[in-house]
């Protein structure tokens, strides 16, 4: 298995290590519940250095990205901002989801999921070639995510001023962006490994709780954030994955990969919904969801530490209404449908 440069640090802190897409990563450090609650109420630090970082080089980076992605990078060029977007194939299917960061000097950085890194490198390089844009995979970079309502207290000494959501601060080869995967105020730090170790040691010495993958999953589910490979893949489009808002058609003359195919699929009969239940039992991916006049399937499910009930996402027919059901261990469970962001729908 591969390991991040902080592997020994995780073990020293009591991390329970598991195989995650070929990487030895901490599932938790003793209590998933405590880690989840710490991020919701205070602050926590994640090592997400298994994710893939690609830096671009060349004069036509903007042109390349405008063709590569359905979301339009032009809206952040020159603004020290970050932008979320799916990356599509020519049929409009989702190859991955990623964040693009503007680094200054007309240069961009892409961060994508770890399980798709090799596939993404090949795809990015292929699409970039006609634009004469280089794609540099940064295999030796550190990515830390400092997340939680008190995260600013621990990052303020490293940034010149407060930065708003989806903003980027890039100085001395350290990029700090106000992005994250928890639904809380937070910052993601990308730098070389030596600096990454210094950041990690600083936060841990100041009693910031390390957070494992288990809490990361429950946090993102509560916040309504999709997990690629679980809630969406190449068989899905943004329209049936609750990210149709990323398809930017404001510039009618702009072409992008999958545009024509999406025109034919924009009236998808399926949508990604949230569900919750007061009954016991966690519905996992693959479970069938039934409602009057249709059906669907669970993509993600968990017990919510914040709301003390079982929640999840399901891909269902648009006519699903407000109530559905599922069967768990031969017992019928009543489900209530909602939007996928439970921090909004259940607050």
Listing of model-derived features with the role each one plays in the protein:
Residues 99-100:
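Glycine-rich, Trp-frequent "lid" loop and neighboring beta-strands that shape
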Residues 1-21, 25-27, 33, 103-347:
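Conserved, structured C-terminal
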Residues 1-88, 93-95, 214:
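Acidic, proline/glycine-enriched N-terminal capping motif
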């Amino acid at each position: 298995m591969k390991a991040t440069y902080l592997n020994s640090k995780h073990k020293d802190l009591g991390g329970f290590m598991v195989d995650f897409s070929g990487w030895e990563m901490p599932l938790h450090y003793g209590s998933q519940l405590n880690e989840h609650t710490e991020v919701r109420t205070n602050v926590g630090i994640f090592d997400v250095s298994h994710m893939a970082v690609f830096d671009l080089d060349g004069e036509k980076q903007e042109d390349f990205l405008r063709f590569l992605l359905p979301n339009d990078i032009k809206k952040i060029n020159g603004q020290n901002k970050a932008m979320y977007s799916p990356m599509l194939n020519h049929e409009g299917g989702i190859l991955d989801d990623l964040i693009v960061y503007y680094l200054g000097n007309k240069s961009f950085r892409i961060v994508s999921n770890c399980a798709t890194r090799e596939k993404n490198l090949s795809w990015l390089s292929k699409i970039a070639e006609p634009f004469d844009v280089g794609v540099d995979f940064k295999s030796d970079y550190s990515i830390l995510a400092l997340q939680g309502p008190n995260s600013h207290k621990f990052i303020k000494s490293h940034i010149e001023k407060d930065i708003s959501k989806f903003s980027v601060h890039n100085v001395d080869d350290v990029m700090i962006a106000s992005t994250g995967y928890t639904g809380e105020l937070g910052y993601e730090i990308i730098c070389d490994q030596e600096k990454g170790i210094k950041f990690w040691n600083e936060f841990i010495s100041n009693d910031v709780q390390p957070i494992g993958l288990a809490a990361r999953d429950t946090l993102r589910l509560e916040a309504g954030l999709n997990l690629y490979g679980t809630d969406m893949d190449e068989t899905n489009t943004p329209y049936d994955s609750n990210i149709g808002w990323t398809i930017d058609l404001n510039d009618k003359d702009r072409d992008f990969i999958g545009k024509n195919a999406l025109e034919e699929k924009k009236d998808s009969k399926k949508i990604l919904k949230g569900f919750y239940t007061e009954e016991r039992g966690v519905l996992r991916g693959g479970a069938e969801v039934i409602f009057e006049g249709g059906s669907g399937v669970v993509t993600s499910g968990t017990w919510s530490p914040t709301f003390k009930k079982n929640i999840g996402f399901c891909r269902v027919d648009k006519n699903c209404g407000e109530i559905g059901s599922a069967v768990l261990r031969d017992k019928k469970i009543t489900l209530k449908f909602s939007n996928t962001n439970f921090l909004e729908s259940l607050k």
